[in-house]
Amino acid sequence: MNQRLSPIKVEVKTEYIEAQSTPDEEKYLFSYTITIINLGDQDVTLKSRYWCITDANGQQSEVEGAGVVGETPTIKPNTAYQYTSGTVLETPFGVMEGNYTMIKSNGEEFKAPISAFSLAVPGLLH
């Protein structure tokens, strides 16, 4: 697998979903909206995802699977694909990071890294 710079840029926005969270039961729901931008010169298809989710207690969970939100999108050069998903933590703070396995139109497979981002109840961190 080629480990050169990825032609993919990943942007993340997160939101705490207070209405569906129950802190007394250690259930904190977060949504995250991901924008995947193809900066390369070929179509790329997202084949699978890998996430490592760590809560404030250091508990880690790994999530792997085909595509995202039931899709394996093909992203044309200089365009973007966006989706929203969510996760539940047992603590009011956590971190997610991972990668997407992508395939270029020429058949070359590569990993597009997703840098670590925070999930936090507003006002918790100063």
Swiss-Prot record:
<protein>
    <recommendedName>
        <fullName>Protein ApaG</fullName>
    </recommendedName>
</protein>
<dbReference type="InterPro" id="IPR023065">
    <property type="entry name" value="Uncharacterised_ApaG"/>
</dbReference>
<dbReference type="InterPro" id="IPR007474">
    <property type="entry name" value="ApaG_domain"/>
</dbReference>
<feature type="domain" description="ApaG">
    <location>
        <begin position="2"/>
        <end position="126"/>
    </location>
</feature>
<dbReference type="Pfam" id="PF04379">
    <property type="entry name" value="DUF525"/>
</dbReference>
<dbReference type="InterPro" id="IPR036767">
    <property type="entry name" value="ApaG_sf"/>
</dbReference>
<dbReference type="GO" id="GO:0070987">
    <property type="term" value="P:error-free translesion synthesis"/>
</dbReference>
